[in-house]
Amino acid sequence: MIDRLTDIGVNLLSRQFDEDREAVVERARAAGVTRMLITCTDLAESSLGQAFCRANPDGFWCTAGVHPHHAKDVGRDWLDQLTELAKDPSVKAVGETGLDFNRNFSPPEQQLAVFDAQLTLAADTGKPVFVHDRDSEGKVFELLNRHRGKLPGVVVHCFTGTRLDLQLYLKAGFYIGITGWVCDARRGQDLRDIVTMIPLDRLLIETDAPYLRPHNAPAPPPGLEHHKRRNEPALLGCVAAQLAQLYGVDHADVAQASWQNASRLFDLPDPA
C-alpha cells in the first residue's frame, strides 16, 4: 500500500510544467501524493493558482501572496487585490512571503514593508503564513514574533537555516517545511545534522518542484530523460524516505505525521 502524502509546496504553475502538467499530476497521484498546495509568488500567479484550483477542486489548493523578490513590483492597490484573493476558499495560506537578503532582488526596506503587511493580512483573514527566510539574520523571526499572537499558524517553507533559527521557530510553535535539500549529502549536511530536532508533529514535507530534485530520486522513466534535473511532486516520497532514515522511523510514520500536520495547519480535507 502506498502511503498518502501532501506536498505543501509545489510550483505547479511553473513554465517547466507547461508541456506535461496533466501527466505530472497523474504521476504524483500514482505515487500517493493526493493533496498539493500550489505555491504562488505574486498577484498574477495567485490569481492563476486560484483559477487552477477552482477548475481542479479535488486535492488542489494554493497560497496567495507576494514573494520578497517581487516586493519592488507591487502597485498602489496591491494589498486590496491580495485581500480579495485571500478570501477565496481555495487559498489556504498567505504567501509565499518573507525576506531574502541573499539576493536582494528587492530593496530590504521594501521587503520588510510588504512582509509586514502580509502578516497583518494573514491575521485579519485567519489564514496561516507560508514563509520564505533566506539570510534574514533574524528579521523574519522578529516580524513573525511581533504578530505571533494574532497569526493562526506559520510554516517556514524550505527550511535551510541554522540550529538557532530552528530552535527559535520551534519554540514559537511554528511548522517547518523540509524539501529535497535534506537528500543532498553534501549541500544538505548541515540540515541533516539538525532536522531531527523537529518533532514529528511540527514536520511538513514539500518538493518545491520543479526545483530541488532529491538526490535519492530514481532516474526519469523512458520518454522523460530530458527532464532528468526537474523535480516533480511524484518524488515527494524520496523526501519522506530520507527523513524516515534520519529519524529512525518507518516511511509511514513520516507520511502520516506530515499528512496530519498539513490537515491541521491548512484546514485540508481528505481528497474525495
Regions found by a protein language model. Give the residues of each.
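Mid-domain alpha/beta scaffold segments of enzyme catalytic cores
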Residues: 1-272
